[in-house]
């Protein structure tokens, strides 16, 4: 098996969808945001439904090995309950729906509340799907096990004649390696940075704080390369990750060749204060940015971020002040480039950003997924990790 993997980011405006395609052919999809407007060829957002369906068809598949929803905000789940087959009800099955072999969700998604007027909201349908799979004991991993979730699950297991601990193997704690992928066999492993149990035990659940965050480590050509897959975290969440990871002597899990930056380039992932021209990261977040390796890439899943006067007054992300901070720190580490999904190759007709992870490093490439990819001349590669 050739050690050549791909990481793809799809241009879905201020939203998230990315995919890992392993050398073995296994596919892991993070989040799903299909914009209905994208079905109009005049809009810049990609028609995600068509794109993913075409990619799977070309690979002779009707499923993803893993679909991970980092959290339940609409810009991370929009259109998912129309696209994917759901096991909990027959009306969400068949008719060309794409299957999910294993669903990854934060515990917070199973604890979401909704009144009777919102039972058909997508986050509720995904909550029902996750609860169904967990209760059936198959095709799911749940990240963290807060007491509120145990209080819901254990009486139901007892009613089925099962032990309260019968689903413990389906819960994954922060600071551990996710089962099902092996660095030696699969050339990849997933280290869970977040969520922590406290994210669901301190009153109201804050989706962004309780979201999935991973260090994804690839093996290629005898070396390893690291990808930080981050949801809509804020600076306090990243500070916790940096401090706790270091405390447990896992500092290498903070290193990165590729970093999907949080929350569509929001300044709040760096500091609670935006700054006039540039956001100043808090010390732990600054440390995380400086853990990037030479020739590394930063990716913002967002609208374009032009450096013009109006951008500096922007209230909602993306924030030019955050971009300026990211680019400054990328320069400090000798990084390669800061890329925005809705800017590449241009803002009128953006295309998926495709990175190849292979012998020598992480390379931004162009070309159709599943077809022959054309590596740019003098390919820019994110450097090696010391072993």
Where are these regions (language model features)?
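Active-site neighborhood of phospho(di)ester-bond hydrolases with catalytic His/Asp-centered motifs
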Residues: 29-33, 63-77, 104-108, 227-236, ...
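Short, solvent-exposed loop/turn and secondary-structure capping segments
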Residues: 18-20, 30-31, 40-42, 78-81, ...
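Active-site metal-binding motif and surrounding structural segment of the metallo-beta-lactamase
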Residues: 42-103, 249-268
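Conserved beta-strand hairpin/beta-sheet module of binuclear metal-dependent hydrolase folds
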Residues: 2-62, 210-236
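Flexible, acidic/histidine-containing loops and adjacent segments that form or flank the divalent-metal
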Residues: 1-5, 62, 81-236, 303-387
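Active-site-proximal structural scaffolding
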Residues: 13, 41, 76, 96, ...
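Short, glycine/charged-enriched secondary-structure capping and boundary segments
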Residues: 23-24, 44, 82-84, 118-119, ...
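Long, structured stretches of catalytic cores involved in phosphate-ester chemistry, encompassing
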Residues: 236-339
């Amino acid at each position: 098996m050739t050690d050549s993997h791909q990481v793809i980011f799809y241009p879905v405006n201020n939203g998230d969808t990315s995919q890992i395609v392993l050398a073995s052919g296994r596919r892991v999809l993070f989040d799903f945001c299909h914009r209905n407007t994208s079905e109009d060829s005049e809009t810049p957002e990609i028609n995600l439904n068509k794109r993913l369906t075409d990619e799977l068809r070309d690979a002779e598949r009707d499923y993803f090995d893993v679909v991970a929803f980092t959290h339940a905000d609409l810009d991370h789940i929009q259109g998912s309950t129309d696209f994917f087959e759901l096991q909990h009800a027959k009306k969400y099955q068949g008719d060309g729906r794409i299957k999910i072999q294993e669903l990854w969700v934060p515990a917070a998604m199973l604890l979401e509340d909704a009144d009777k007027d919102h039972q058909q909201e997508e986050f509720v349908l995904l909550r029902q799907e996750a609860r169904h799979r967990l209760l059936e004991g198959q095709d799911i991993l749940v990240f963290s096990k807060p007491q509120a979730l145990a209080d819901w699950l254990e009486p139901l297991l007892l009613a089925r004649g099962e032990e309260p601990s019968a689903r413990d193997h389906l819960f994954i704690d922060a600071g551990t390696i996710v089962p099902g992928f092996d660095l030696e066999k699969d050339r990849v492993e997933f280290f869970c940075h977040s969520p922590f149990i406290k994210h669901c035990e301190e009153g109201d659940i804050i989706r962004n704080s309780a979201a999935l965050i991973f260090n994804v480590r690839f093996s290629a050509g005898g070396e390893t390369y690291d990808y930080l897959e981050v949801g809509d975290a804020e600076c306090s969440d990243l500070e916790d990750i940096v401090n706790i990871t270091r405390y447990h002597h896992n500092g290498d899990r903070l290193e990165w060749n590729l970093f999907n930056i949080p929350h569509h380039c929001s300044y709040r992932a760096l500091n609670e204060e935006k700054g006039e021209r540039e956001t100043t990261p808090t010390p732990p977040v600054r440390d995380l940015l400086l853990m990037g390796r030479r020739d590394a890439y930063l990716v913002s899943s967002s609208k374009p971020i032009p450096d013009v006067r109006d951008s500096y007054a922007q209230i909602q992300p993306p924030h030019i002040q955050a971009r300026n901070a990211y680019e400054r720190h990328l320069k400090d580490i000798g990084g390669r480039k800061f890329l925005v999904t809705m800017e590449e190759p241009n803002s009128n007709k953006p295309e998926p950003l495709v990175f190849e992870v292979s012998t020598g490093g992480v390379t931004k490439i162009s070309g159709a997924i599943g077809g022959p990819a054309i590596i740019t001349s003098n390919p820019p590669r994110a450097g090696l990790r010391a072993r």
